[in-house]
Structures are given as structure tokens and as C-alpha cells.
Amino acid sequence: MASVVNMCNSALNLLGASTISSLTEDTKNARLCNQRFEPIRDRVFRSHNWNCLIKRVQLAQDSTAPVVEFSYAYTLPVGCLRVLKIHNGSTDSIKSDLEYKIEGRKVVTDQSTIYLVYIDQITDPNEFDSYLREAISHQLAADICYAITNNSTLANNYMTRADERLREARFIDATENSLD
């Protein structure tokens, strides 16, 4: 069963470093993993339309309308890391873009009903694709490499390897859908 600690230990193993039992233990490696895992995970999540992270919801109108320009405001879901598509639910509107803007954690538009397709901030690694888990572990290893090894050449090499793993994971993920 996958866990954040397992993913961190995969990163530490890549570096030849001591593994951890928990993110809160009082070791340098645990502190680094605890500090860097979530930002790395979210950066990787935002970098691609990962199939395992896509959510679709109808947004509820906010009670307060925008001050100018648009008629309606909607609050983005708490875990929304990236908006992929906004539509009004009719078949042809899914293929055409509606006029809207993202302002902070709000969507403003003139549409009275909207649906959101977005990248969700899923925290359970068991819900990640295996390639995504591996890509995150490699990105984490590259990120913490210098702090653990004090070797900039090795850190640069790991960044190259991590980027290769990320490209591979994106390719595998992108080819799972039917052709448009």
C-alpha cells in the first residue's frame, strides 16, 4: 500500500540516504521530506492534466455578485489546484470556451450555471497512478539531493533523471484517453 512515507523513502533510497519511519521524526531526512513533499507533489500535479486527479463538479453561485464586468461569482473547490475547463453543461458548450476569469479563489462569469473540470489536490497516494507516484518521488529526490549529499553535480544529474521520469509519466497518462 502506497503512503507519503513510502514515496519519501523511495526518494531517499535513490540518494542512498537513510530512510524514515514518519515525517515527524527528528531526523534531517524526515524534516526535509516533511518540508518539501507537499510543494513538490502540488507542482507535479499542476504540471499536467493527470487522469487520476481530474474532478468534475457543478459550482454553486456565490450569494454576492462581482462588483463589475461579470454577473456571477463562484468559489473554486478547496482542493482545486488548476482549472482545466469551465462549461455550462450543454453538449456544444463543452467544446467551446465560455468567457470567464479566475480571480483569487473565484470564477467570475456571465453564466448562471457552470460546471468545472479541474485538477484536485488528492492527498492519498493510493489514488495516484504508479507512474505519477514514481515521478513525484524522483522530483523529491532531485529537490532534496543537494541538502543530503552536498554535491551539486549529483543534484543536477538527479534533476535530469527526475525530469525524464516526469516526461515518461505524462506521456503514459496522456495516451490513456480516446483520440478526440
Where in the sequence are the language-model features?
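Short, intrinsically disordered N-terminal pre-domain segments
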Residues: 1-23
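Short secondary-structure subsegments characteristic of cysteine-rich extracellular domains
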Residues: 25-44, 154-170
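Hydrophobic/aromatic-lined pockets within catalytic cores
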Residues: 12-20, 41, 45, 49, ...
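Internal mixed-charge
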Residues: 6-7, 93-180
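An acidic- and aromatic-residue-enriched active-site/binding cleft used to recognize and process polar
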Residues: 17, 25, 36, 55-59, ...
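Short, charged/polar micro-motifs that form catalytic or ligand-binding hotspots
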Residues: 1-2, 23-34, 122-134
